[in-house]
Amino acid sequence: MSFSRRQFLQASGIALCAGAIPFRANAAGQQQPLPVPPLLESRRGQPLFMTLQRAHWSFTQGTRAPVWGVNGRYLGPTIRVWKGDDVKLIYSNRLAENVSMTVAGLLVPGPLMGGPARMMSPNADWAPVLPIRQSAATLWYHANTPNRTAQQVYNGLAGMWLVEDDISKTLPIPNHYGVDDFPVIIQDKRLDNFGTPEYSEPGSGGFVGDTLLVNGAQSPYVEVSRGWVRLRLLNASNSRRYQLQMSDGRALHVISGDQGFLPAPVSVKQLSLAPGERREILVDMTNGDEVSITCGEAASIVDRIRGFFEPSSILVSTLVLTLRPTGLLPLVTDNLPMRLLPTEVMSGAPVRSRDISLGDDPGINGQLWDVNRIDITAQQGTWERWTVRADMPQSFHIEGVSFLIRNVNGAMPFPEDRGWKDTVWVDGQVELLVYYGQPSWPHFPFYFNSQTLEMADRGSIGQMLVNPAS
């Protein structure tokens, strides 16, 4: 292996300094505040404008890198809508290539889901009116362009989408955006020496980087009051799954999954977050001690040195976010609510069963995506049992539906996974009870796909026709 004098000096510097300086950010003084995306709300029938364009962003101090984003910033604003509203959304593509967008987890008819059937060429717009009829949930919007989704999401075409309803407004939980209720968008990237993201499609599987980002920042901190803090977690990485825990071992209180609140809070010490998956957690900060969210073991000194000469998939730092309590009085002082939602009882029985196979190679059930082929035909208002198997562990998403996890490799799902979902980690076999609540049409089908974005780009996508209820 040959390498430059500059690379040798950089590697030598790491080897000399790594033992003396913790490689987390590295010290508190070098941490930057958590960037909180601006909030864009639907009110009084006003349209929401979403401009897809080039921008610049600072991933490392003192540098600015070219990125893509929405409304002039890396990633995009947080969208907040209300159940019962009809929201007009105006996408404007000011990029030099075709883009299609979707809101993952949104329950609307097929023609309004976006995706390949709603491709925007450069300088084109798309303006759907979205009927918001689902319960409160944390969703996300992102590029969904055939053969380009992985690159476009990596570039920055993604953001959080919040649905609120009467229940979410009245629950005694934090709900002041940017004060005690924060979006936490987790990604991994590979940055060059100038702080610019690098992307190269892997020969197999999905992209993994060595630098962890939250809302576009490395190892950020956020100042919070001494009370309950609500974190809305989104894994917007191309393929990496995270196992989250608190640095001092305190509990994470899970209150919501992909499609809304759990019946009751679930306290866990470790929490899985698969690509495309969303979870909401509450953290108790009443003791006034600083604490961090982490995600496993960081790279060793040898791994860090090796990373200067070849791409690494091992995270340099596993620090996700530091919570720093202040002397401010909490906005929410109540105890954790015992119940969030009444327990729902499934009405009706599955009308049929399906087997879905995700292999090491691209494709679903041995077939690559074909825009002219409908793979599944179902009926609105019915249930089906899906058994999903994966040879290579990966995340799996179904558009336009909600599902319950019946079992994971023959065992009951964890309590935090027993709410309504649209995305699931598959390592072996999972059995799902899928409910078709929305219709789609042949030219505007729903999609089910690997949430390893590179696998989806290579053809791990199926198309689903849901006939309207008669």
Language model regions located:
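Short, surface-exposed ligand- or partner-binding patches at beta-edge/loop junctions that are enriched
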Residues: L139-H142, G288-A299, W441-T452
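N-terminal export signals
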Residues: Q7-A27
